C-alpha cells in the first residue's frame, strides 16, 4: 500500500540551521548534505534533522542555474565556522505537505500534492520551499501570505 501526502495550512515555527549553498543540478544535494554533516561533526556542533531550502523551481530553471541551501537544524545557541553558514527562517504561515515514504517516492508525491494544491487555489509555487526529513517523514513547507 502506498502512502498519500497530507496537505495542511498551518503556522510553522522558526528554524535555525547551518548550511552550504549549492548551485547546479539538484542531483548533487545528497553529497553536499554529507559534506555539511561532516563539517558539523568536525566542528563539534550538535544538530538534529536535515533541512533543504529550494530556492529555484526546477520546472522553469535550467539545471545549471538552480540554487538550494542544504544543511541541518541547530539549537538556538549553536554557532558554526566557515565554510558553513548560519541562518534563521522566521515563524510563518505555510502550506505543509507531509508523507512517510521511501525517498524515491516521497519527493515526487509531496511536490505533486503541493503543485495540485496551488493549481486548485489559483496560485503559483512560492519559493523558497523548506524540506525537513524527520524520522523517515518528509515535510515540505511553502510560504503563504506574500502574494
State where each predicted segment sits:
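A solvent-exposed interaction/effector surface
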Residues: 1-147
Amino acid at each position: 500500500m502506498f502512502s498519500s501526502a497530507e496537505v495542511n495550512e498551518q503556522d510553522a515555527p522558526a528554524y535555525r540551521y547551518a548550511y552550504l549553498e549549492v548551485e547546479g543540478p539538484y542531483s548533487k544535494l545528497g553529497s553536499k548534505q554529507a559534506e555539511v554533516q561532516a563539517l558539523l561533526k568536525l566542528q563539534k556542533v550538535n544538530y538534529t534533522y536535515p533541512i533543504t531550502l529550494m530556492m529555484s523551481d526546477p520546472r522553469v530553471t535550467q539545471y545549471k542555474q538552480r540554487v538550494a541551501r542544504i544543511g541541518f537544524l541547530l539549537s538556538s545557541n549553536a554557532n558554526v565556522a566557515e565554510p558553513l553558514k548560519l541562518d534563521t527562517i522566521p515563524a510563518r504561515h505555510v502550506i505543509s505537505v507531509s508523507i512517510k515514504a521511501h525517498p524515491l517516492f516521497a519527493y515526487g508525491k509531496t511536490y505533486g500534492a503541493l503543485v495540485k494544491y496551488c493549481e486548485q487555489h489559483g496560485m503559483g509555487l512560492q519559493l523558497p520551499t523548506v524540506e525537513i526529513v524527520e524520522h523517515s517523514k518528509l515535510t515540505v513547507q511553502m510560504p503563504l501570505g506574500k502574494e
